Amino acid sequence: MTRSEADLQDEFLWYKDAIIYEVHVKSFFDSSSDGMGDFRGLLEKLDYLESLGVTAIWLLPFYPSPLKDDGYDIADFFDIHSNYGTLSDFREFLREAHSRGIRVIIELVLNHTSDQHLWFQRARRAKPGSRWKDFYVWSYTPEKYKEARIIFKDFESSNWAWDSVAKAYYWHRFYSHQPDLNYDNPRVHEAIFRVIDFWLEMGVDGLRLDAVPYLYELEGTSCENLPETYKFLEKLRVHVDDKFKDRILLAEANQWPEDAVAYFGEGN
């Protein structure tokens, strides 16, 4: 272990004064001359980032994806998009970043997946009420949760989309190719925790949690900022703190201040 790596393990509040550099791998540096940035290219530029005084790198989504929403439509939480390299490339990048005293934060989309994700492909073919069907939110009518606003009105006319395989509607707060996970299902919690454990056990220093206000649905509400969402985030924080040391969870709640304040907790 290098001195920089040892120092990283002893900085409890490292994020308080971190200089965080946001990187979209695909547009940063191309090591193979194929017109696409990659992890080998990012690795080549670590000395440059270190010279700038950067102490943490925040990576935008790099997972396998149809790329209909710039990678936020994730098709596999456990791998790297082939355009950007391999898991081995990522591990080498992570190791070399740490050797320079640079931490790494990655994006994790909690609310939804791509409709190409294996979970959804299983769900749409599963029987109603079965383990895989309940990974997502289904209905035989598009009339539920009418109080929930449509976020992308220019592109979507409803928060429900018909699936011809399942013969039912599925819920999506974002684009219709991004079905929402069903957080009323404890198995979804377990699956997401496995994803988190995979990356944190690899050595990732933090997660930027995307689209957290929309995790739960409840009739008669806006389906945003529900008490169940706060409880899940507390559960997630406890899970991470129990298993890992000094890891940051940077959650996105794109809400008005009076609605966002509850996400800060009360001493917890």
Regions found by a protein language model. Name each.
Residues 199-209:
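Active-site regions of oxyanion-processing enzymes, predominantly non-cytosolic
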